[in-house]
Swiss-Prot record:
InterPro entries: Aldolase_TIM, His_biosynth, HisF, IGPS_HisA/HisF, RibuloseP-bd_barrel
Keyword set includes Amino-acid biosynthesis: yes
Family: Belongs to the HisA/HisF family.
Protein's name according to its UniProt entry: Imidazole glycerol phosphate synthase subunit HisF
Gene from which this protein is expressed: hisF
Locations listed in the record: Cytoplasm
Gene Ontology cellular component list: cytoplasm
Function: IGPS catalyzes the conversion of PRFAR and glutamine to IGP, AICAR and glutamate. The HisF subunit catalyzes the cyclization activity that produces IGP and AICAR from PRFAR using the ammonia provided by the HisH subunit.
SUPFAM superfamilies in the cross-refs: Ribulose-phoshate binding barrel
Pathway(s) served: Amino-acid biosynthesis; L-histidine biosynthesis; L-histidine from 5-phospho-alpha-D-ribose 1-diphosphate: step 5/9
Recorded superkingdom: Bacteria
HAMAP family for the chain: HisF
GO process terms (BP): L-histidine biosynthetic process
EC identifiers of the protein: 4.3.2.10
């Protein structure tokens, strides 16, 4: 059985790591390079950087953050936020990223995902889906522009389409659960896991270690992404891995 991955997520704006609730109310959590080094030492399997402002002036800041991080850590880095054209991908990969995460640009121009996969490989091409449950229904709608813009697109159908366009992985965030510490949206995650054959990363809502376990077991995620519980030192990545290993989840120990 493939080992499951634990991925801390760093939301970056203005060169600082922040954490919010349902994409709002941001708190400063520190320097991204220092935090990345700490997670590397704790045995994180990967790290995800999301540039949550992603303005053109912020792009150079993010390239610097990625470059400085890649010089000092050994785990794979995924970078997302404002990836709009092939040149954005090239810059991030040249700075030391291993994968890029495409969100808004995929909705605006789905063939961009195909171009990215053909140029750089599916293994580099992650499609991020921010989804919110449709009130009173067992379906989820895709949102873009950092969760600000509803699209009318069904999240499960979108994941299937993105796989067909060459995405190698889906980063699936429940906007309803983001920062709430109430646990992943297991129904959303399971629906996408069952619909695609590529790995799905569960994101949004981890408040304790059992939530990670549920993400791997009940929802079937290949990887679990978390921020608050790690940033604010509720748990270390190592503690999370020891807990999961103790409950029978195949995990890479360091």
């Amino acid at each position: 059985m493939l080992t499951r991955r634990i991925i801390p997520c760093l939301d970056v704006t203005g060169g600082r790591v922040v954490k919010g609730v349902q994409f709002l109310e941001l708190r400063d959590a520190g320097d991204p390079v220092e935090i990345a080094e700490a997670y590397d030492l704790q045995g994180a399997d990967e790290l995800t950087f999301l540039d949550i402002t992603a303005s053109s002036d912020g792009r150079d800041t993010m390239v610097d953050v990625v470059r400085h991080t890649a010089e000092r850590v050994f785990m794979p880095l995924t970078v997302g936020g404002g990836i709009r054209v092939v040149e954005d991908i090239r810059r991030m990969l040249n700075a030391g990223a291993d994968k890029v995460s495409i969100n808004t640009a995929a909705v605006s121009r789905p063939e961009f995902v195909n171009e990215a996969a053909e140029r750089f490989g599916s293994q580099c091409t992650v499609v991020a889906i921010d989804a919110r449950q449709v009130p009173g229904e067992q379906r989820w709608e895709v949102y873009t522009h950092g969760g600000r813009k509803p699209t009318g697109i069904d999240a499960v159908e979108w994941a299937v389409r993105m796989e067909s366009y060459g995405a190698g992985e889906i980063l699936l965030t429940s906007m309803d659960r983001d920062g709430t510490k109430d646990g992943y949206d297991l129904a959303l995650t399971r629906a996408v896991v069952d619909a695609v054959s590529i790995p799905v990363i569960a994101s949004g809502g981890v408040g304790n270690l059992e939530h990670l376990y549920d993400g791997f077991t009940t929802a079937g995620a290949s990887a679990c992404l978390a921020a608050s519980i790690f940033h604010f030192r509720q748990h270390t990545v190592q503690e999370a891995k020891q807990y999961l290993q103790g409950r029978g989840v195949p995990i890479r120990m360091v």
